[in-house]
């Protein structure tokens, strides 16, 4: 099993509902969802596996037990306040489409940093195969250092908030997929989002889709 700590909109929020339909998977219900357009199944296959989310603590195998991990998640959530996110929009991110913030958000960065560092004692180290896979795409010196120390290259100063909507797209695919995604999510993205909880997702085994296991309110 792998666990991850994510930001995810509440299950009744229009953004969650619309994005789950876009991906074809509702990680809260653990159920497939009809997609709004033909041709989406293949280009959303990779993000569908993880569910709609923004990563705070990347997926990891536990070196401890789930109960002690959740105890520390609860303790962390009790020290961090809820906050409003900046307006969000569909953007290109290195060829992928993702929902991203339109302005920097210091509380969001602080929350992600705390999740990475505070929960790291529960992380089992990556094996040689995982290290090789992560390095296969080419990493900067900072990213490689993070990979060795934190098990993932895109954390702390190299972290970027993003809620992935597609695989990497060609220019021709971008030409129709980006406006389709923006249109599908437009009314939901017009509403300001709040970060009010840490969402713990779990993956029971390799290749299985992630599901929401628990949502822990931020009460600091």
Model-predicted segments: where are they?
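Small/polar glycine-rich anion-binding or flexible loop at a beta-alpha turn
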Residues: 194-202
